[in-house]
C-alpha cells in the first residue's frame, strides 16, 4: 500500500488565541478550527465539527479566513500554499461544479462523474480561442489553445501530458483536447475523411480493444497512448501518429470480480443476431475468459449500440469491411480458445480436449482462424524440441496445455491490437514536411493495489520518468518567475528522483536488467529473482525487503511505497512467441491472420539475443522522453474525487493521495522552498495597508509603500519584484496575525461606539414612546365621552324620523291603491272599445291583403321562373367564358404562339386570295384571247372553203365550156386527161382543207370546254375564297379577343404604343384608357360602343403593313431605348443625394421602369444592369456612408415594388397574409410572388398634379420583374448585415477594454492626496472606453440619418448591436471570475448608464427597444452591486432581482462573485444548494445547462414588416439629375408644370 512520505517545510508560524488553523485528521485528512489555548509546543483547537483537539504547533497550518467563498481559480494566488489550503480550494470549487483549477500553468481536472455538455460545446470553444491562459476560467481548452498558439508563434513543438489514476478522466480529457485541436486546425472536407476526423474517430476503436472496466473505472485504458498531431505552416492539421505503450496482455485470460475483460469481447457478444450465429457466440457468461467476473454489463451503457459505433469508427479510420470481419473473427476465435479445457491423455504427462464441448470450441476456433484442426490441437498439447540429432515431440500435461492456450490467446490479441494501431497510423498518414506538432500523452497514472505485478511495476516506472520531467519543468517555471520579477534569490533545492530511476533502469545492476538476466536462464524462478534483488539492493534506501515475505519487494516511489509480488514477473517479461503457435497461424488460409504472424527474418531467427517486455518498454519510454524533451510541455493532472464513481462526493484522503501521485504537492513543495506567497502590489496594499497608515498617506509609489509596510512589521527574507511582493513561508501568517490584532482593536472601538449610540437611541425612542402613549390615553377618554353624547342625540333624531316615516308610508299606500283601482276600471273600458275597432279594421285589411297576395304570388312565381331560366343560361355562358379566361391566363405562352400562328395563317390566306384573284384574271384574259383567235381562224377557214367551192364551180363551168368548144377527139381527150388530173388535185386539196377544218372545230370545242371548266373552277375558288375570308375574319375576331384577355401585348404593339406615347400625350392617354377599358370589359362594365371601338382599333393595328411596323420603327426605338438605359445606369452610378428625405436614385429608377413598362415584359436586361451597378457600388464593405446610401435606395425601391407589383393572375385576390415565422427575407422568396397591398396612386407614379387621387393601379409583373424584386430583397439583407457587422467590428475591441478596465485602470491606493486625482483619472479612463462605444454608435446613427435610411431599419440595427453588446459583456462576465466583483459591477453599471443616456438622446424613433436588449447584463450587474446578498432568497433573486437569468446563469454568477470592496459574501449556502437541486432536475436538457448567450446574426425583419413600417410618399415632384434632365427620352420625369 502507498505510505505518505511527503511533508512540507517546517516553518515557524506565529499563532495566537483565536487564530483559525488546519490540523490533521486520519479520516478526512484536514479539519479547520479555532485556537483556544496555547501550551508551549501544543495547542488546543476547537474544531468546526464540535470536538476539541490537542495538536502540536508544528503540525498545524494557518487558515485564510478571507479567502473567496468560491475559491480561487489559480492556487498560486492562495495566501497560504499548503496541503489543507489546496485541498479546501479544490473541494469548494468541486462543490460549485468548477472541475478545473490551475496551479500555475498546471491544470487540475476533477472528474465530475456526470455530463457537463455546456462547457464543451462549440460556443465555449469559440470563447477560449486565442484567449491568454488565465484570462478566462480554467479549462482544458485553455491549455490546448496555449499549446497551439505557442506552436504557431514560436514554431516549436508542444506536448500536453495527461496523467491520473484509473477513473480520473484521462481518456475524456484527451478526447476534449483532440477535439479542440481539431477545431483550431481543422479544414473543410476535400477528399473523403479529414485527418482530424480520423484522429478523433480512432478513440472509439482503441477504446474498444484497449479499455476495460476495472475496480476504479468503467472505461480504464489498459495501455499508454501518445498522439502526435502534426500541423502545416498555416496551422492546419496535416498528419498524425498514434504510439501505444504496454498493453495489459494478461487481462485477456485473467480478470477478477467485479472487473471486465476488454470491451470488444462484450461488444461482439451483443452484435446483431446474424453475426452471433456466424461466429457461434452466445452470452458472455458462457465464455471462460469473460465469466471469471460476474460483471457482464455496464450501467447506462449499451454494448449493442457501442458495437455499431465501433464499426462506424472503423469505417472512418479506413478499416475495410473485409478487414473488420477478419478482426471480429479473430476476437471470436480467442473466446472459443478460452473455452477449450484439457484432461489427462492415455500417455504419461499428456493432455487431450476434455469433452465434446471443448472439441466443439476447438473446431470453431480452427474454423475462425482458418487453420488445421489437428495442427491447432497439437500446438496446444505438444511441444517440438529440435536437437542436433533429431526432432523430439513432447506432450504437455493439462496444466501446461492451459498455459499454452492462454499464451496463444494473449499473443493473438496483442498482435491484433498492434495491427490496429499500425492500420490507423497508415490510414491517417503522417506529414513528412511538418515541422511542428502537438503531442497528447494519455498514460496510466501511479498505481498501487493489494496485488501489484509486472504491469504496475512498469506503470510506476513510467510515472517516475514523467515525474522527473515534471519536476524539471516546475523548477524551470519557478526560475522564470523569479527572473521575470528581477528579484535576488538563491537557487532553490531541486527535488530529484534520479535514485529511484537508477534503481529500476540502471545497467547492469538495475531491477529491469536483473529481471532480463533471470529470464535468460531456463531454471530461474521468481524465488531466485527475488533473492538476487535482496542481495543486490540490500543497502539501497529506495529498496525495501518485507519481513513476512520471501518473494515480494517494495520500492519507495515519489508518491509512496509500493509492494510488488514477483511471482509472475518472469513470465510476463518474456517477449517471444511459441514456435508451434507461429507455425500454426503462419500457415492459416486467412491472409489477415497470416499478416498478424509474418515469418521471422532469417537473421532474427538465428540470433540468440534475448528480447524482453521490460527492455522493449524501457526503450519505448526512452524514445517518449526524448520526444517530450524536444517539446514545450503542458500538464493536466486528472483527479478522481471518490471511488464510488458518483457525482458530488469529495473524498479528502483519496484526493490527497492522488495529488501526491500526480506531483501536484511536489510542485507546491518546490514553490514553498522559495517564495510560496506572491501578491500583486495593489492586493498587498488592499490587505495590509492598515498595518502602516503612514505608508498610505505619504506620496509614495506602490512598491515603496509595500517596502515600508514590510519594514514596519520587521519581516526579513522577503523580496519585492517588479509587480509582486514575494514572501517566505510563514510570513503571510505573521502579517495576517498582526492584521487580525489591528482589526480586533478597531472592532472593539467600533463596538463600543455602536453600543453607546444604540443605548442613547433606545432612551430617546423610549421617552418619545411614553409621551405618545399618554397623549393617546387622554385622547381616547375624550373620544369615548363625545361618543356617548353623540349617540344620545342620534337616538332622539332616529325616533322622530321613524314615526314620521311610518305615517307617511301608510298614507302613500292607501293613495296608491285608490289610483290603481280607478286606473284599472278606465283601462278595461278603453281596451274593450279598442278591441272592437281593431277587429273590424283587421277584417277589412285581411280581405284586401289576401286578394293582393294571390295576385302577387302568381306574378312572383312567373317572374322567378323567368329569372331562374335567364340566370342559369347566363351562368352557363359565364362559366364557359370563365373557363376560357382561366385557360388563357394559364396558357399565355400557348395563346401567344397560337396568335402568332393565326396571324401567319391570315397573312398566308390573304396572299393566296390575292394570288387566286390575279390568276383568275389572267386566266379569263387568256381564255378570251384564245376564243377570239379560234373564232377568227374559224372565220378564215370558212372563207377559204367558200372561195374553194366558188373556184371549183367556176372551174367546172369552164370545163363544160371547154368541152363544148373542144377540137377533135384526141385533142379533147388530152385536154380531158389534164382536166381530170387538175380535178383530182383540187379534190385532194379540198379534202385536206376539210380535215384542217375538222381539226380547228375540235380545237375550238376543246377551248370552249376548257373555258367552261375554268369558269367552274373559278366559281369553286370564289366560294373557297369567300370561305377563307370568312375563316380569316373569324380568326381575326378570335385574335382580338385573345388580345383583350392577355396582360402583355406582342412586341410589335408595344413598340407602336411607345411610339404613340413619345409622339403625342393624347395617344398615350388613349392607350391607357384602352388598358383600363380592357380590364373593365373583363369585369363586365364595358359599354357596347366602347368594345366595338376597341375591336376596330385592335383590328387596324394588326392589319398594318408588316414592313411599316416591324422594321424601321422597332429598330430605331430599340436603339433609343438602349441609349436611355445606358444613360440611366450612368446617372445612378453617381451619388444623386436626396430630395425631401426621398432617395432620388430609387425614385428615378422606379419611374423609368414603370414608364418603360419593364415590369410587364418577358425579357429585359435593365434589371440585371441595375443589380450589377448596386453590387459594384457596395464592393467597398468598410465604407459605411456608401452602404447607408445604398441601403436607403434599395429599401425605398423595394417598398415601391412591393406596393406596385403583383404576380400574374393575382388581380382581385385578397392580399396574402404575412409569414408567421421567417429567419430571413431571402429564405422566403415565395413571399415575393404574393399579392401586394392594394393600389398605387397614379398621381404618385405618373406625376399628375391633380385628379386621379382616387385612382389606384397595380402592375401584373412578369418573371424578370419578380426576380429583380427577389434580388433587391437579397441586397437589402446583405447591405443591412454589412452595416451591422461593421459596427460590431468597431465596438468589439472597446467591449474587451470595458470588461477588462477595472483590472488595468484601478487607481493606486497610495500617494496620499493624489489618490483622489488618480481615482478621477481612472474613472475617466474607464468611461473613455464606454464613450468610445457611444461615439461609434453616434457616428453610425448620424451616417444612417444623413442617408435617410428608414427608421425601421435603424432601430433593427441598433437593437441587434445592443443584443451583441449584451452577449459579449454577459459572457465575459461569466467566464472571468475577476470580473464578477462588486467594484467591477459598479464600473460596468456606470458604463451602462452611458448607453442608456445615448438611447434617450437617440429617441425611440431610432433606438427603439435597444435598451431592453441589455437585460441580461443589466440584471447581472444589478446582482453584483446589490447589498446583503446572503439575506436574499432564491425566489427574490430569480423573480425580483434577475427574472431573465436562467438558474444556470444565476448559479454561475453566485458562485463566482467576490466582494473586493467591502468583503461581503455571496448568497447563502442554502440558496446555492437549492440552485444545484434545480440544475440537477434539468441536467438532461443540454440546452438548459448552458449559461452562455448566443449572438443572433439573422435578419430580424421581412418585406412586409419593412413595407408596413414605411409611410407612403409622393415621387411626382422629384427633380431628375442634370445628366438626364435635358434628354427628351426622359421628359416624363419632369413635373407637369414644366
Curated annotation (Swiss-Prot):
Gene: XI-C
Biased composition (Basic and acidic residues): 1017-1032
A single GO BP: organelle localization
Family per record: Belongs to the TRAFAC class myosin-kinesin ATPase superfamily. Myosin family. Plant myosin class XI subfamily.
Region feature Actin-binding, mapped onto this chain: 503-537, 539-562, 597-621, 621-643
Protein name: Myosin-9
Highest rank taxon of the organism: Eukaryota
SUPFAM superfamilies xref list: P-loop containing nucleoside triphosphate hydrolases (SSF52540)
Domain IQ: 743-772, 766-795, 791-820, 814-843, 839-868, 862-891
TM segment ranges: none
Disordered, as annotated region: 1017-1041, 1098-1121
Domain Myosin N-terminal SH3-like: 16-65
Function statement: Myosin heavy chain that is required for the cell cycle-regulated transport of various organelles and proteins for their segregation. Functions by binding with its tail domain to receptor proteins on organelles and exerting force with its N-terminal motor domain against actin filaments, thereby transporting its cargo along polarized actin cables. Involved in trafficking of Golgi stacks and mitochondria.
MF-aspect GO terms: actin binding; ATP binding; calmodulin binding; cytoskeletal motor activity; microfilament motor activity
Residues annotated for ATP binding in this entry: 164-171, 217-225
Amino acid at each position: 500500500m502507498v505510505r505518505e512520505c511527503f511533508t512540507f517545510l517546517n516553518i515557524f508560524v506565529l499563532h495566537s488565541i483565536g487564530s483559525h488553523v488546519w490540523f490533521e485528521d486520519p479520516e478526512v485528512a484536514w479539519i479547520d478550527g479555532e485556537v483556544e489555548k496555547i501550551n508551549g509546543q501544543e495547542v488546543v483547537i476547537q474544531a468546526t465539527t464540535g470536538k476539541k483537539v490537542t495538536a502540536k504547533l508544528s503540525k498545524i497550518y494557518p487558515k485564510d479566513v478571507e479567502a473567496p467563498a468560491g475559491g480561487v481559480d489559480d492556487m498560486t494566488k492562495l495566501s497560504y500554499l499548503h496541503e489543507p489550503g489546496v485541498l479546501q480550494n479544490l473541494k469548494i470549487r468541486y462543490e460549485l461544479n468548477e472541475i478545473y483549477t490551475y496551479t500555475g500553468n498546471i491544470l487540475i481536472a476533477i472528474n465530475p462523474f456526470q455530463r457537463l455538455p455546456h462547457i464543451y460545446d462549440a460556443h465555449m470553444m469559440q470563447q477560449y480561442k486565442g484567449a491568454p491562459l488565465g484570462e478566462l476560467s480554467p479549462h482544458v481548452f485553455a491549455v490546448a489553445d496555449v499549446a497551439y498558439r505557442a506552436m504557431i508563434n514560436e514554431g516549436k513543438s508542444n506536448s500536453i501530458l495527461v496523467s491520473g489514476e484509473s477513473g480520473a478522466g484521462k481518456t475524456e480529457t484527451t478526447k476534449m483536447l483532440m477535439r479542440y485541436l481539431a477545431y483550431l486546425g481543422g479544414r473543410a472536407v476535400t477528399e473523403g475523411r479529414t485527418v482530424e476526423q480520423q484522429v478523433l474517430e480512432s478513440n472509439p476503436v482503441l477504446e474498444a480493444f484497449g479499455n476495460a472496466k476495472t475496480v476504479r473505472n468503467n472505461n480504464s485504458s489498459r495501455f499508454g497512448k501518445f498522439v502526435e498531431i502534426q500541423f502545416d505552416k498555416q496551422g492546419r492539421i496535416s498528419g498524425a501518429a498514434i504510439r501505444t505503450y504496454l498493453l495489459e496482455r494478461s487481462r485477456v485470460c485473467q480478470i477478477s470480480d467485479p472487473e471486465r475483460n476488454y470491451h470488444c469481447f462484450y461488444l461482439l457478444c451483443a452484435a446483431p443476431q446474424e453475426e452471433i450465429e456466424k461466429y457461434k457466440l452466445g452470452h458472455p457468461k458462457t465464455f471462460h475468459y469473460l465469466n471469471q467476473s460476474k460483471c457482464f454489463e455496464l450501467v447506462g451503457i449499451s454494448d449493442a449500440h457501442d458495437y455499431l459505433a465501433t464499426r462506424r469508427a472503423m469505417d472512418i479510420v479506413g478499416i475495410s469491411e473485409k478487414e473488420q470481419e477478419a478482426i471480429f473473427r479473430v476476437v471470436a476465435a480467442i473466446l472459443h480458445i478460452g473455452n477449450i479445457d484439457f484432461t489427462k491423455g492415455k500417455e504419461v504427462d499428456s493432455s487431450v480436449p476434455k469433452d465434446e464441448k471443448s472439441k466443439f470450441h476447438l473446431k470453431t476456433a480452427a474454423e475462425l482462424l482458418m487453420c488445421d484442426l489437428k495442427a491447432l490441437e497439437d500446438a496446444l498439447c505438444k511441444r517440438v524440441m529440435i536437437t542436433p540429432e533429431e526432432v523430439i515431440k513432447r506432450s504437455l500435461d493439462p496444466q501446461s496445455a492451459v498455459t499454452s492456450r492462454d499464451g496463444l490467446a494473449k499473443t493473438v490479441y496483442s498482435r491484433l491490437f498492434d495491427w490496429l494501431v499500425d492500420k490507423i497510423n497508415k490510414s491517417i498518414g503522417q506529414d513528412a514536411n511538418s515541422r511542428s506538432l502537438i503531442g497528447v500523452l494519455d498514460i496510466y497514472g501511479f498505481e498501487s493495489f493489494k496485488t501489484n505485478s509486472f504491469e504496475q511495476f512498469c506503470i510506476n516506472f513510467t510515472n517516475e520518468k514523467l515525474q522527473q520531467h515534471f519536476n524539471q519543468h516546475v523548477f524551470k517555471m519557478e526560475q522564470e518567475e523569479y527572473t521575470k520579477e528581477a528579484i535576488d534569490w538563491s537557487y532553490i533545492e531541486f527535488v530529484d528522483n534520479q535514485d529511484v530511476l537508477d534503481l529500476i533502469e540502471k545497467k547492469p545492476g538495475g531491477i529491469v536488467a536483473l529481471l532480463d538476466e533471470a529470464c535468460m536462464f531456463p531454471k530461474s524462478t521468481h524465488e531466485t529473482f527475488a533473492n538476487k534483488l535482496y542481495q543486490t539492493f540490500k543497502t539501497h534506501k529506495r529498496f525495501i525487503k518485507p519481513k513476512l515475505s520471501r518473494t515480494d519487494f517494495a520500492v519507495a516511489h515519489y508518491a509512496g511505497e509500493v509492494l510488488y509480488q514477483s511471482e509472475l514477473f518472469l513470465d510476463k517479461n518474456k517477449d517471444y512467441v511459441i514456435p508451434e503457435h507461429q507455425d500454426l497461424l503462419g500457415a492459416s488460409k486467412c491472409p489477415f491472420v497470416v499478416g498478424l504472424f509474418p515469418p521471422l527474418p532469417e537473421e532474427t531467427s538465428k540470433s540468440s539475443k534475448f528480447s524482453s517486455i521490460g527492455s522493449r518498454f524501457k526503450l519505448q519510454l526512452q524514445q517518449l522522453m526524448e520526444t517530450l524533451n524536444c517539446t514545450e510541455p503542458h500538464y493536466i493532472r486528472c483527479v478522481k474525487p471518490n471511488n464510488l464513481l458518483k457525482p458530488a462526493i469529495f473524498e479528502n484522503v483519496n484526493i490527497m493521495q492522488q495529488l501526491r501521485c500526480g506531483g501536484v504537492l511536489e510542485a507546491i513543495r518546490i514553490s514553498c522552498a522559495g517564495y510560496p506567497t506572491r501578491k500583486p502590489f495593489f492586493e498587498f496594499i488592499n490587505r495590509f495597508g492598515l498595518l502602516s497608515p503612514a505608508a498610505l498617506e505619504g506620496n509614495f509609489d506602490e512598491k515603496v509603500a509595500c517596502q515600508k509596510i514590510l519594514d514596519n512589521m520587521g519581516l526579513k527574507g522577503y523580496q519585492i519584484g517588479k509587480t509582486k511582493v514575494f514572501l517566505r513561508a510563514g510570513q503571510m501568517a505573521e502579517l495576517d496575525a498582526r492584521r487580525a490584532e489591528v482589526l480586533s482593536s478597531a472592532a472593539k472601538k467600533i463596538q463600543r461606539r455602536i453600543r453607546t449610540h444604540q443605548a442613547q437611541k433606545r432612551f430617546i425612542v423610549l421617552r418619545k414612546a411614553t409621551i405618545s402613549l399618554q397623549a393617546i390615553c387622554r385622547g381616547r377618554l375624550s373620544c369615548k365621552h363625545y361618543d356617548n353624547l353623540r349617540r344620545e342625540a342620534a337616538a332622539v333624531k332616529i325616533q322622530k324620523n321613524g314615526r314620521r316615516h311610518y305615517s307617511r308610508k301608510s298614507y302613500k299606500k292607501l293613495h296608491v291603491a285608490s289610483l290603481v283601482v280607478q286606473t284599472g276600471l278606465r283601462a278595461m273600458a278603453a281596451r274593450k272599445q279598442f278591441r272592437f275597432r281593431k277587429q273590424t279594421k283587421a277584417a277589412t285589411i285581411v280581405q284586401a291583403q289576401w286578394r293582393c297576395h294571390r295576385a302577387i304570388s302568381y306574378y312572383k312565381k312567373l317572374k322567378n321562373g323567368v329569372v331562374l331560366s335567364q340566370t342559369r343560361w347566363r351562368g352557363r355562358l359565364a362559366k364557359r367564358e370563365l373557363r376560357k379566361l382561366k385557360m388563357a391566363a394559364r396558357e399565355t405562352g400557348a395563346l401567344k404562339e397560337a396568335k402568332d400562328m393565326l396571324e401567319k395563317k391570315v397573312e398566308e390566306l390573304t396572299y393566296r386570295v390575292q394570288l387566286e384573284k390575279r390568276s383568275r384574271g389572267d386566266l379569263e384574259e387568256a381564255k378570251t384571247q384564245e376564243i377570239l383567235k379560234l373564232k377568227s381562224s374559224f372565220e378564215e377557214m370558212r372563207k377559204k372553203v367558200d372561195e374553194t367551192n366558188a373556184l371549183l364551180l367556176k372551174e367546172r363551168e369552164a370545163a363544160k365550156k371547154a368541152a363544148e368548144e373542144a377540137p377533135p377527139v384526141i385533142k379533147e381527150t388530152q385536154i380531158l386527161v389534164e382536166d381530170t388530173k387538175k380535178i383530182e388535185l383540187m379534190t385532194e386539196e379540198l379534202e385536206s382543207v376539210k380535215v384542217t377544218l375538222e381539226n380547228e372545230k375540235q380545237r375550238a370545242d376543246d377551248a370552249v370546254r376548257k373555258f367552261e371548266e375554268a369558269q367552274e373552277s373559278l366559281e369553286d375558288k370564289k366560294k373557297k375564297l369567300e370561305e377563307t375570308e370568312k375563316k380569316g375574319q373569324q380568326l381575326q375576331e378570335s385574335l382580338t379577343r385573345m388580345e383583350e384577355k392577355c396582360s402583355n401585348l406582342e412586341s410589335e404593339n408595344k413598340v407602336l404604343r411607345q411610339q404613340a406615347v413619345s409622339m403625342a400625350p393624347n395617344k398615350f392617354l388613349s392607350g391607357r384608357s384602352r388598358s383600363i377599358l380592357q380590364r373593365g370589359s373583363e369585369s363586365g362594365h364595358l359599354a357596347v360602343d366602347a368594345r366595338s371601338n376597341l375591336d376596330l382599333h385592335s383590328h387596324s393595328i394588326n392589319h398594318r403593313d408588316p414592313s411599316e411596323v416591324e422594321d424601321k420603327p422597332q429598330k430605331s426605338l430599340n436603339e433609343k431605348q438602349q441609349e436611355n438605359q445606358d444613360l440611366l445606369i450612368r446617372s445612378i452610378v453617381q451619388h444623386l443625394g436626396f430630395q425631401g428625405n426621398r432617395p432620388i436614385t430609387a425614385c428615378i429608377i422606379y419611374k423609368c421602369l414603370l414608364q418603360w413598362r419593364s415590369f410587364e415584359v418577358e425579357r429585359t436586361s435593365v434589371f440585371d444592369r441595375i443589380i450589377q451597378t448596386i453590387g459594384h457600388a457596395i464592393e467597398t464593405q468598410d465604407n459605411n456612408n456608401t452602404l447607408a446610401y445604398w441601403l436607403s435606395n434599395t429599401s425605398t425601391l423595394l417598398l415601391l415594388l412591393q406596393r406596385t407589383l403583383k404576380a400574374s393572375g393575382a388581380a382581385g385576390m385578397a392580399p396574402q397574409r404575412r409569414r408567421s415565422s421567417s429567419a430571413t427575407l431571402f429564405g422566403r422568396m415565395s413571399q415575393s410572388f404574393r399579392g401586394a397591398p392594394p393600389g398605387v396612386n397614379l398621381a404618385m407614379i405618373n406625376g399628375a398634379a391633380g385628379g386621379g387621387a382616387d385612382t389606384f393601379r397595380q402592375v401584373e409583373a412578369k418573371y424578370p420583374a419578380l426576380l429583380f424584386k427577389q434580388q433587391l430583397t437579397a441586397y437589402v439583407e446583405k447591405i443591412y448585415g454589412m452595416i451591422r457587422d461593421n459596427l460590431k467590428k468597431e465596438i468589439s475591441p472597446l467591449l474587451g477594454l470595458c470588461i477588462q478596465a477595472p483590472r488595468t485602470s484601478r487607481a493606486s491606493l497610495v500617494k496620499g492626496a493624489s489618490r483622489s486625482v488618480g481615482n478621477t483619472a481612472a474613472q475617466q479612463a474607464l468611461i473613455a472606453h464606454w464613450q468610445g462605444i457611444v461615439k461609434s454608435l453616434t457616428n453610425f446613427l448620424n451616417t444612417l440619418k444623413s442617408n435617410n435610411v428608414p427608421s425601421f431599419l435603424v432601430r433593427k440595427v441598433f437593437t441587434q448591436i445592443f443584443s451583441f453588446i449584451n452577449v459579449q459583456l454577459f459572457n465575459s462576465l461569466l467566464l472571468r471570475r475577476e470580473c464578477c466583483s462588486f467594484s467591477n459591477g459598479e464600473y460596468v453599471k456606470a458604463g451602462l448608464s452611458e448607453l442608456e443616456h445615448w438611447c434617450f438622446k437617440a429617441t425611440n424613433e431610432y433606438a427603439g427597444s435597444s435598451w431592453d436588449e441589455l437585460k441580461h447584463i443589466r440584471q447581472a450587474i444589478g446582482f453584483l452591486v446589490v447589498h446583503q446578498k446572503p439575506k436574499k432568497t432564491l425566489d427574490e433573486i430569480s423573480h425580483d432581482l434577475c427574472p431573465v437569468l436562467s438558474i444556470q446563469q444565476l448559479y454561475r454568477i453566485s458562485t463566482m462573485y467576490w466582494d473586493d470592496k467591502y468583503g461581503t459574501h455571496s448568497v447563502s449556502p442554502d440558496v446555492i444548494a437549492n440552485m444545484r437541486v434545480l440544475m440537477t432536475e434539468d441536467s438532461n436538457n443540454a440546452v438548459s445547462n448552458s449559461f452562455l448567450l448566443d449572438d443572433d446574426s439573422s435578419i430580424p425583419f421581412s418585406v412586409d414588416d419593412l413595407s408596413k413600417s414605411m409611410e407612403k410618399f409622393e415621387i411626382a415632384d422629384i427633380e431628375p439629375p442634370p445628366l438626364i434632365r435635358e434628354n427628351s427620352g426622359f421628359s416624363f420625369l419632369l413635373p407637369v408644370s414644366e
